[in-house]
């Protein structure tokens, strides 16, 4: 699942870079737009400015001031939870 997320994030637009931080892989353009973190039974995709994303598929979790995440339990959920849409939105926000 981590590799699926990496492919989507790096294909979300030009100038995407990745770095290993905080125990996961962080993706940025001019600023961080998402990160992927692997756990024993799931993978989370974190959005630092997730409160600004349009949650048209009702997949975002978290109720903090800014951060939101999507939890993935199987490779099929990458598609069924519309992850590419959320990552593209986050990239567009980071790009400005």
Where are the regions a protein language model picked out?
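Charge-dense, helix-prone N-terminal extensions
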Residues: 1-96
